[in-house]
Amino acid sequence: MEKVQQTIRAPRGTELQTKGWVQEAALRMLMNNLDPEVAEKPEELVVYGGIGRAARNWESYQAIVDSLKTLESDETLLVQSGKPVAIFKSHEDAPRVLLANSNLVPKWANWDHFRELEKKGLMMYGQMTAGSWIYIGTQGILQGTYETFGEAARQHFGGSLKGTLTLTAGLGGMGGAQPLAVTMNGGVVIAIDVDKRSIDRRIEKRYCDMYTESLEEALAVANEYKEKKEPISIGLLGNAAEILPELVKRNITPDLVTDQTSAHDPLNGYIPVGYTLEEAAKLREEDPERYVQLSKESMTKHVEAMLAMQEKGAITFDYGNNIRQVAFDEGLKNAFDFPGFVPAFIRPLFCEGKGPFRWVALSGDPEDIYKTDEVILREFADNEHLCNWIRMARQQVEFQGLPSRICWLGYGERAKFGRIINEMVANGELSAPIVIGRDHLDCGSVASPNRETEAMKDGSDAVADWPILNALINSVNGASWVSVHHGGGVGMGYSLHAGMVIVADGTEAAAKRIERVLTSDPGMGVVRHVDAGYDLAVETAKEKGVNIPMMK
């Protein structure tokens, strides 16, 4: 991949570079994904998650930008794995962009085949929100991480992580949310990463409190704050596959153990034991097969240590990076003895159509986001947990790129909020349109048997019809852009997922699209979980009037 050193930053304000606000939104969000404040390696078009890219190569990026600038309001741009391939006449209520990223026929859906195609320039890895142009930096996963640790606290520690120690690893774009999510729940956390730049970045953005290269110092500080029952987050430089076994050897058992290293990609995401970043980069180039094997061996040691900590009483869970699967394939037959985070903590939220709803101020003015915060506090005042989140986010979350906010809203709530936002744009309370989107990690938009759909009640973990139906209904209902991806989060062969974005530009047409899309999108989550036999989803569907023909 050619590296290009240029600073990309989304335009701000109300002057259009395109022929309409929906096209403008797509352009600004593509560029925002590559803002140095947002992207992990913008010079390589990498947004987050190992090699999750916004466009296939620099030529394709420029062609997408040029296409968006000339795209009419009754045309649709088609993007195939980060490359613009067609513009067709459609209609004003159709999506302006349709994206399909990293999709492979199942028999060929593996990293080896993907890399062959990538080498030929025929495909890119879109992760989830990288290739669908709705990544907002680490805040994008923060509330989900906060909810996960909060639910762990409720189930195991009396409702708070005060006086507990969490041990985790991986401080990239996704994992970087962990330190702040733990301290927001009152706990102490040691978060390990092999890359000093990742730790520095989290400290700079106030997601992590301190840095150390010493395990002894990390443990001393952690114990001090644990005793005081005060929160602190410690970024520890090192390799988790070395540090966790060392802690097991010393008989040190944290209260909570998880992991968010980029284990989904053994070649580009994970660093084997005994290698510096530079040595790893050299081996990756010279002998990728050996690199992958060493990575897998290190991951197996990593999981063995997590299992040992679980046996000694640590609450241990997989945070969705497929590390258990790798260890299992390497011969560790009890790798799945600890659960994934969705069945352990998140699925009840999915049954209510809840998920990571996000919005972005195209104006670039933080005041627009603060005004929308007030809407949440006013309109959802009875949801104290949600309001607490908004208040904490205002105080502790630093914006990356265009100002944005995330919060988990459910069926009915998303459409209500979208309507209000559109009215605020229409009456001038907000200075420019707002982009509304979500992660692909949502209640009804993903099939991922080792993550979002792990241990489904009816055994339908691998059924991939649901994300396809989600993308189809969002497209016909008028989402501004819709994406279908493969391999996000857990790697090639292990997931299919869909994303949507809708623009609130203050028009009556947008209001109708928002009502349709923000009803059917979370509605798919309720439907999917009703179909799998979850009582809470059935209750939600009946209470909200979701029309499900065969629901009993």
From Swiss-Prot:
GO MF? urocanate hydratase activity
> Which PROSITE patterns does the entry mention?
UROCANASE
The reaction(s) catalysed by this protein are: 4-imidazolone-5-propanoate = trans-urocanate + H2O
Required co-factor?
NAD(+)
The catalytic activity of this protein is classed by the Enzyme Commission as 4.2.1.49
Protein name in the entry: Urocanate hydratase
Say which enzyme class the record assigns.
lyase
Manner of cofactor binding, per the entry note: Binds 1 NAD(+) per subunit.
Top-level taxonomy: Bacteria, Bacillati, Bacillota, Bacilli, Bacillales
